[in-house]
């Protein structure tokens, strides 16, 4: 074989090796980028990144809490932890996790949304509610009204929301967990007022949603429509969101009205087991949720206007939280699975009463 042929083939073999090496480098870089984007534990164990997929109005709560947990975890383990947040309507967020969003933990508006992840994607153990105290709900809230200063439309209870001259703002129960709590609180009032008369209850709900000016996809969007876009006479809102609005905009612009009856809202939390196992973040993810029950975690919840589970912390902040008569989903609606099927699934009661 001529020398120039041997040299050419040698060059070709060298080029193939070089190309293969470059492909490996690119693959390694792509894998590294994917891990960085979704969060993971570093190979040396010195850093960990978590993704908390949460519902709409918890932004301020977890911004403060994440800083406290990072300090606690660093002191306890020597490991640096950063927590990325994703926020949106609770139902929409649950679907994102089901569709592949690599959450290490979920902190959603209601148990049904976490059950959906467990059942449809099998990413969470079925017994998730039993793993932490109070069925994995570290804080509670309820549903109230936010009106403009002076309450010009004289809104004092649910009955005032069906008056023809009242414009209501509430999110869409198809995408928002808070909206489902709002709807069920209104239904509980109608059920008590009309003595379980299903026809009258449905007419009340139809009249109420007939007054709704816009259905935003999440609670924070509804708050923005009411406070910044000037839409509506009344916002049906999470209690914590209403108080946060007063803190941000001032009591000279808005005021809170507590209805005669509301609902005990219990937003739950869970580790996304298979994702955390895959990413090597399980230990930090479990600690992240457990720390919510610590004195520090409970105080941060209370400061952000969530009702803490810890009795001592609740007593410290009791003046902040007025006593409101509430029903529970379990007793009034037979649990979230039944409530979802009856009211919010396609073809359910909400679809029949909302005609816009």
Question: Model segments located where?
Answer:
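Extracellular/periplasmic juxtamembrane helices and adjacent flexible linkers that interface
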Residues: 276-356
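Positively charged n-region of N-terminal signal peptides that target proteins for export
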Residues: 6-7, 13-18
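Ligand-binding pocket segment of bilobal, Venus flytrap-like solute-binding proteins
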Residues: 194-260
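Stable alpha-helical elements in mature extracytoplasmic
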Residues: 57-61, 65, 93, 110-113, ...
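Alpha-to-beta junction loops
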Residues: 100-107, 165-167, 228-234
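C-terminal motif of bacterial Sec signal peptides marking the signal peptidase cleavage site
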Residues: 29-33
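A conserved helix-loop-strand patch within extracytoplasmic ligand-binding domains
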Residues: 118-192
């Amino acid at each position: 074989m001529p020398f120039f042929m041997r040299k050419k083939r040698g060059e070709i073999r060298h080029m193939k090796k070089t190309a293969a090496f470059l492909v490996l480098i690119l693959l390694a870089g792509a894998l590294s980028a994917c891990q960085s984007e979704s969060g993971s534990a570093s190979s040396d164990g010195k850093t960990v990144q978590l993704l908390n997929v949460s519902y709409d109005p918890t932004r301020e709560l977890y911004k403060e809490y994440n800083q406290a947990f990072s300090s606690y975890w660093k002191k306890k383990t020597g490991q640096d932890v950063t927590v990325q947040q994703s926020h949106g309507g609770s139902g929409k967020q649950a679907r994102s996790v089901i569709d592949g969003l690599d959450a290490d933990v979920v902190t959603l508006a209601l148990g049904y949304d976490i059950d959906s992840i467990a059942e449809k994607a099998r990413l969470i153990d079925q017994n998730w509610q039993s793993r932490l105290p109070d069925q994995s709900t570290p804080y509670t809230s309820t549903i109230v009204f936010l009106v403009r200063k002076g309450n010009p439309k004289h809104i004092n209870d649910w009955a005032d929301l069906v008056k023809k001259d009242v414009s209501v703002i509430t999110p869409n129960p198809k995408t928002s967990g808070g909206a489902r709590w709002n709807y069920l609180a209104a239904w509980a009032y109608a059920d008590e007022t009309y003595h379980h008369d299903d026809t009258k209850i449905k007419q009340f709900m139809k009249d109420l949603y007939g007054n709704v000016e816009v259905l935003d996809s999440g609670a924070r969007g509804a708050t923005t429509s009411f406070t910044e876009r000037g839409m509506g006479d009344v916002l049906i809102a999470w209690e914590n969101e209403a108080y946060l609005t007063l803190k941000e905009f001032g009591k000279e612009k808005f005021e809170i009205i507590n209805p005669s009856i509301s609902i005990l809202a219990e937003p739950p939390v869970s580790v996304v087991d298979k994702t955390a196992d895959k990413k090597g973040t399980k230990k930090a993810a479990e600690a992240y949720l457990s720390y919510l029950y610590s004195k520090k975690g409970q105080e941060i919840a209370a400061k952000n206007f969530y009702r803490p589970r810890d009795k001592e912390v609740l007593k410290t902040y009791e003046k902040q939280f007025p006593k409101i008569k509430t029903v529970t989903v379990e007793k009034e609606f037979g649990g979230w699975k039944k409530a979802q099927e009856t009211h919010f699934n396609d073809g359910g009661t909400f679809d029949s009463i909302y005609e816009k």
